[in-house]
Swiss-Prot record:
Gene Ontology BP term (one): urea cycle
EC number: 6.3.4.5
Catalytic activity: L-citrulline + L-aspartate + ATP = 2-(N(omega)-L-arginino)succinate + AMP + diphosphate + H(+)
Locations listed in the record: Cytoplasm
Record-linked HAMAP family: Arg_succ_synth_type2
Gene Ontology cellular component annotations, sorted alphabetically: cytoplasm
Positions contributing to ATP binding: A17, F18, S19, G20, G21, L22, D23, T24, S25, A43, G129, T131, D136, D194
Keyword Flavoprotein among record annotations: no
Family classification: Belongs to the argininosuccinate synthase family. Type 2 subfamily.
Chief localisation class: cytoplasm
Keywords linked to the UniProt accession: Amino-acid biosynthesis, Arginine biosynthesis, ATP-binding, Cytoplasm, Ligase, Nucleotide-binding
Keyword Ligase among UniProt keywords: yes
Protein name per Swiss-Prot or TrEMBL: Argininosuccinate synthase
Amino acid sequence: MSTILESLPTGQKVGIAFSGGLDTSAALHWMKLKGAVPYAYTANLGQPDEDDYDAIPKRAIEYGAAGARLIDCRAQLVAEGIAALQSGAFHITTAGVTYFNTTPIGRAVTGTMLVAAMKEDGVNIWGDGSTYKGNDIERFYRYGLLVNPDLKIYKPWLDQTFIDELGGRAEMSEFMNQAGFAYRMSAEKAYSTDSNLLGATHEAKDLESLESGIKIVNPIMGVAFWRDDVKIAAEEVTVRFEAGQPVALNGVEFKDQVELLLEANRIGGRHGLGMSDQIENRIIEAKSRGIYEAPGLALLYIAYERLVTGIHNEDTIEQYRENGRRLGRLLYQGRWFDPQAIMLRETAQRWVARAITGEVKIELRRGNDYSILSTKSPNLTYQPERLSMEKVASTFSPRDRIGQLTMRNLDITDTRDKLRVYAQVGLLTPGESSALPQIKSDSGE
């Protein structure tokens, strides 16, 4: 039997991930009128653009929900965000600027915690606002079924009857007004925004055009650093890690990591730190574009990466980066709790993060412009006296280096022989003005 229901299951409990916005409000009331028994579940993810979470379940009851619950997901969200940071689970970058996978992390937390709450209430049918062209429909599908194998999926936006009756925001607003709720449709923005405590995503509408840039976005976690009228003073900040966990900002220790990340958001946000413009591949392989904010994670990541490079050796760092990119893709695809992801994540947390203890001082300026001012750690393997150009006691002598270079003759000879072979088979041609062979063009010239 299919786990996806294409029509409303009347007379049955249907859980809906309820944001309180127009779409989910109209869907909930519509389901009630059509004979379903809707239950509303709201995730408190610390969204920076939401100021009254307690009012959301009350609105759900008003619109016809048989039950409504507010689930505090903030601690779990921050824990998963720090786990992603420790693992370097970020695969989308442009010219060194990183997207911190904040929406995929949020979906992992929401998809598991809301379905767990539904299961407690005997609700085994789940709906949410994700569309069939996006990533979230698959992420929620995977996480929901991981938690509840008996789960069925009903999405109003996949139900043709719902689409025919309430196919757009204007129709939804009129539907709510006719029902007596005086629901005013919010002003249309030039793009869509989704956010949580870790970061914000701006996409769709005008941002689908690559001719529209970051300047049309109004940041919700920071400042528009590209505007000349926005005054931003340089600021020094210290970040301290202990055994891979961020514990202090500017010398102030935080026992609660949610509070630490909120403060990191405030500090980074004052500069517009962590904003990026990315073109990415969705799960279905089509390309999309997003403008992202993550001021707090960006601040922590600068300090964490600095300590990683000062503490670990080259091969460990290489493996950390390669595995981090693989893990980032798994996270993006909704596989954060799959065995292969857990294996990569646990390895990084155990063998990379646990050694990360120290303090980094950073000067923040505008946007992603910053300088590292100092790095301190009892675990540093960076020891400048080993390579000092000054006359100091050295760990090896000139004769030692001569011997090491002499050993290189073997692989240099091998390389020269291989280049000769490539020239003989026509892959290379002798260069006229160079002692090295040149690669031939496809035309043979």
